[in-house]
UniProtKB/Swiss-Prot annotation:
Belongs to the UvrC family. The keyword Metal-binding does not apply. This is UvrABC system protein C. Residues 12-91 form the GIY-YIG domain. Its main location: cytoplasm. It comes from Acidobacterium capsulatum (strain ATCC 51196 / DSM 11244 / BCRC 80197 / JCM 7670 / NBRC 15755 / NCIMB 13165 / 161). Keywords: Cytoplasm, DNA damage, DNA excision, DNA repair, Excision nuclease, SOS response. Interacts with UvrB in an incision complex.
Length: 645
């Protein structure tokens, strides 16, 4: 059974799906309320709206799925499979960096206590996370000194001939040598350490006071002094710091700043009502979380020729982003604060809060504060994110000139390139052919100047003619309106597309314009007039990376526009896929509700005004299955606290 046939036979309940490549390797894991509807959307988007998803579908040759009982189970299973398989297309944390925990190996004959960043289901007790990170090491050192648990790496599953120095300086009970301590005494020390780590200070104090009095009564004054010193240390520690626990004053607060395709996020860790730490995250380019709104410019009939451009407005979707981010940070973690405050709402916020509550066995407040102190905290996190953005991304600018100078040399330009316009063509076997133009200016993508075109004069598959039409329309208008030509025109394609573009410019009298192209597979740059001398740059060349980035952005915009036009063409026919809906019923539904969107939003009662109840229920069920979470709910970004992605 091929991939498309397998997708058509998927069940309609909730579950998790796994895409595999030709080697049988899992390359992507996702979840869905309705498996068939969600996975089928990949077929409907044969030309995906971003380069990453397009790459996924080009590699995917097989599909597995697992059905579950509800959305909570799907969330948990998806996260678990991502962590186990680490699929290339949706691993979020590049290094799985976490704050440290204190581990107490309760399953061992003689338990040890030490710091770890790796959490396992091994019967041990984990405490934390601790903020800042060095607090965990200070806590463990205090436990070693106070409760005399071993700090060495000696194997305690068997006895040894002699004890180490730690025993003789009274820093260890010596469980490595038989008869130096008793199992009862060691268990008592472990219990003390456990109470201490669990924040049961009052219980520990009472126990120490009783033992101190008993030792004094038995005239064991050295032992009594030890308990006294331990009580003093415990009092001092409780005054200065608090072991991490899940009380009502614990909260994580998020803020973000997005600008020019780059994102900074700040995370405040509030413990006991006080901010104990701050984390920063950075991303550069997040196509998975961009939404576009495009409206064709109004033109008079007499102006139609040379027009038809589409101004594209890209909007960052913070809700979808935070949905993915929070799942990566909190699902299957032993500690989750009772309150998590985010700056924006997202579709599955309540479902995620419910899953985390089941995971932690206490209520989780996952909220978007609107006023008061909580809102002030979110605003403060946002202000800090803006400062982080300034410090991180502004320092990148000095390097930009060096890259521009290198590009100037590579393309033999007389002046430093400040504006590049890049074009790409998209179609499926000649159907709904469209083109995109993206703009790079002074070190950043200038999204306000992006344009998209519907090909009007070319029928069938002819990329060269399509490219010629687009450049003719674009630069005829530039010339008529006396706008400046770009420093470089970049074409996504090979020599054929390059020459077609140059021919269009020459017809407009632009014979000195610099035109270059980049071939997809070879990643070779061709310069018009020097096609026999291709520019081959090193794979790590910043100039090649810049050209690739611009080319990939243009490709993404072209296929996004192509998908939108195809969806507009096919949207009315979607109703015909629903049992009980024929052409007449479809017409009545569209007339009554005004559009497919109106039908999609209607509930069963509203639909019964037009169709019988069984048909209304079928329509509602069909569209309910398509109200799946945003693509990012499966987690489609990488997190790196030290590098720009």
């Amino acid at each position: 059974m091929d991939l498309q046939e397998k997708i058509r036979t998927l069940p309609t309940g909730p579950g998790v799906y796994l895409y595999k490549n030709a080697d049988g390797e899992v390359i992507y894991v996702g979840k869905a309320k309705n498996l068939r509807s969600r996975v089928r959307s990949y077929l409907l988007e044969a030309s995906q709206a971003n380069a990453k998803t397009g790459s996924l579908m080009r590699e995917a040759v097989d599909l597995d799925y697992i059905t579950v009982g509800n959305e909570h189970e799907a969330l948990a299973l998806e996260n678990n499979l991502i962590k186990q398989r680490k699929p290339r297309f949706n691993v979020l944390l590049r290094d799985d960096k976490t704050y440290p925990y204190v581990k107490l190996t309760l399953g061992d004959r003689y338990p040890k206590v030490f710091v770890t960043r790796r959490l396992r289901k091994d019967g041990a007790a984990y405490y934390g996370p601790f903020f800042p990170g060095n607090l965990a090491y200070r806590i463990v050192d205090l436990i070693h000194r106070s409760f005399l648990l071993p700090s060495c790496k000696v194997d305690l599953s068997r006895y040894h001939a002699r004890a180490c120095l730690q025993y003789y300086i009274k820093r260890c009970l010596g469980p490595c040598v038989k008869h130096l301590t008793t199992p009862e005494a060691y268990r008592e020390a472990v219990r003390d350490a456990q109470w201490f780590l669990e924040g049961r200070g009052a219980d520990l104090e009472r126990s120490l006071e009783v033992r101190m009095q008993e030792a004094a009564a038995a005239e064991q004054f050295e032992l009594a002094a030890k308990y006294r010193d331990l009580l003093v240390t415990l009092h001092q520690l409780q005054e200065k710091q608090r072991v991490a626990s899940a009380d009502d004053d614990d909260a994580d607060v998020f803020g973000y700043h997005y600008e020019n395709g780059m994102l900074a996020v700040n995370l405040f860790h509030m413990r006991g009502g006080k901010m104990v730490d701050r984390r920063e995250f950075f991303w550069e380019e997040l196509p998975e979380f961009m939404e576009e709104g495009a409206q064709e410019e109004e033109v008079l009939p007499a102006q139609a020729e040379g027009r038809g451009e589409v101004q594209v407005e890209l909007r960052f979707e913070p809700g979808a982003f935070f949905s993915a981010l929070l799942k990566q940070i909190y699902i299957e973690q032993p500690y989750v604060p009772r309150s998590i405050y985010v700056p924006v709402n997202f579709a599955d916020r309540e479902a995620l809060a419910g899953l985390l509550a089941e995971q932690t066995h206490h209520r989780i407040e996952l909220a978007v504060p609107q006023r008061g102190d909580k809102r002030s905290l979110v605003d403060l996190a946002g202000q800090n994110a803006r400062q982080s953005y300034e410090q991180r991304f502004r320092v990148m600018q000095p390097n930009q000139k060096a890259i521009q100078e290198a590009l100037q040399d590579a393309l033999m330009l007389e002046e430093l390139p400040r504006r590049i316009e890049c074009f790409d063509i998209s179609h499926i076997q000649g159907a709904e052919t469209v083109a995109s133009m993206v703009v790079w200016e002074n070190g950043a993508m200038k999204k306000a100047d992006y344009r998209k075109f519907q090909i009007k004069t070319v029928s069938g598959v002819d990329d060269f003619a399509s490219m010629r039409e687009v450049l003719t329309r674009r630069y005829r208008r530039v010339i008529e309106e006396k706008q400046a030509m770009p420093d470089v025109i970049l074409i996504d394609g090979g020599i054929g597309q390059l020459r077609a573009a140059a021919a269009a410019l020459e017809e407009l009298g632009q014979t000195t314009q610099t035109v270059a192209s980049i071939a997809k597979r070879e990643e070779i740059i061709y310069l018009y007039g020097h096609e026999d001398e291709p520019i081959v740059l090193e794979r790590r060349s910043p100039v090649l990376h810049l050209v690739q980035r611009i080319r990939d952005e243009s490709h993404r915009f072209a296929i996004a526009y192509h998908r939108k036009r195809r969806e507009m063409r096919d949207r009315d026919s979607e109703l015909l896929e629903i049992p009980g809906v024929g052409t007449r019923t479809r017409t009545r539904l569209l007339e009554h509700f005004g559009s497919l969107r109106g039908v999609r939003k209607a509930d069963v009662e509203a639909l019964t005004a037009v169709v019988p109840r069984p048909t209304a229920e079928a329509i509602a069920a069909h569209f309910q299955g398509e109200k799946a979470e945003p693509e990012a709910a499966a987690g489609l970004v990488r997190i790196d606290e030290s590098k720009t992605v």
